[in-house]
Amino acid sequence: MRVLLGIHLPRLPLDVCAPPPSDAEAGAAGCAVLEQGVVLIADAPARRHGVRAGMKRGGVLTLAPGTRLVERDPAREADALRAVALALLRFSPCVALDDEATLIVDVGPSLRLFGGLPSLCRQVRATLAALGYAARLSAAPTGRGAWLLARTSARARVRRRVARPASLGRTLDRLPCVLLPDARPYAGWLDGLGCRTLADLRALPRAGLQRRCGPALLAALDRAYGDALEPLAWMTVPPVFDVRLELPERVEYAQAVLFAAQRLVVQLCGWLAARQLSLAAMTFDLEHERGRQAVPPTALELAFAAPVRDEAHFMRLLGERLARVELPAAVIAVRLKATRVESVEPPADDLFPEPGGTRETRARLFELLSARLGADNVLRAARVADHRPEAANRWLPLDAQAGKAAAGPPDAPPRPAWLLAEPLPLLMRGERPVFHTPLRMMSSAERIEGGWFDGQHVARDYHVAHDEAGACYWVFLERSESAAEPRWFLHGLFG
């Protein structure tokens, strides 16, 4: 079943130019966007002061002098639409940028994956909300039909989600004909004919309509109703992810950048889904003011123990890292770059989940701990080529390279699960060492000698020993020519 989603951003000119929410909440008179000296759209505070679309600049200044007036910025709107399209790639690789702040997404093959159309629409709205945009959503079997339904006024009593072609025709028939861009130049002529809806427009003789209005109007009608093929220019996914976002105001604290970071992370997740990649490392730059006292960007480099593509995990790590950053200057822009990516591994085919979580789950936990506590405070053990048990390993940060792992001795006797920080001297009872009870040797001696090269020379004979309760210990006899009596030590406990 072919289902295309129409996504219209009715406030886009205002969203890319409006002042920060804190200014509006402080009681400002609001903001209005002008195009050629005429109000295109105004926010709620400006409307409360009487500002309406279509008013001229002079009328606005007379009615509400405190209203902030900004010129429409088509370049910023185009950038915002591309950012939304990039984020929507997580739902489908087929995303098209259309006219009048509207996007078309082919979600037919993705419906089952996202739990059906209602669930998919909820997830799309959540993605758009994370980007800071409100939207009107529609669904139809044709792209132009979805576009028309999404562009319908919020006050119109029209069903915006239509799955069957037959239902689409009946729904489109009720829409005003001037909603179709190709019909707007002829709005006066059509109104004079009493032609107000798309049904009225389709009822006109096609030959006469083509002579009067040209072939483009009929072609647009046919594409909307599914009577003609409609070519859609799907977005090309960029080969690399490197996105910069300017902040609406100067930010003095690192954690205040999180909202902007989320907008970039949402786009990153869409890009990863479209490219079928997982992220192994990324760089998040905080750009400061330029000029005579310019400060280089504050760069946060994040590397992951295992490649990931989870938005929540990215945000947790960024939040922990930003909480520990002291800014040298105010932030005016942020930039996110995927520096290392890997192909997505196929899902595991295990019937039952792995006890204790998967390798990816554990890796995410370690990354979160490193971000919160600092990389130098979360360590892992690495083997060292040394026969002495107390020197056979070292502690390294999680992301440190340990080099080639040291190989243990071939056919080495069993080693205890727990090694004491310092060997514990044992008392003697007769010829047997005692730890709670006399110990009985259960293995032959394993001689370990080394350390002459660093001044920590040891010479020991290790044994596995049992006490009377059956507990298992790792003990050694110190080999020393100067000792008058044998000296035994406890060095490890078996589990």
Where do the model's predicted regions map?
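A glycine-rich phosphate-binding loop feature that marks nucleotide/adenosyl-phosphate handling sites
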Residues: 140-148, 278-290, 331-342, 380-395
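A residue-level signal for conserved active-site and pocket-lining positions in enzyme catalytic cores
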Residues: 60, 101, 137, 201, ...
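Mature hydrolase/peptidase catalytic cores and their serpin-fold inhibitory cores, especially
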Residues: 350-495
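Amphipathic, charged-and-aliphatic alpha-helical interface segments
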Residues: 44-45, 49-51, 167-203
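DNA-contacting surface of Y-family translesion DNA polymerases
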Residues: 4-6, 63-66, 187-333, 342-350, ...
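Residues that scaffold, gate, or flank divalent-cation-dependent active/transport sites
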Residues: 1-104, 109-111, 118-126, 135-139, ...
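Short beta-strand-to-loop capping motifs
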Residues: 72-73, 105-109, 249, 304-306, ...
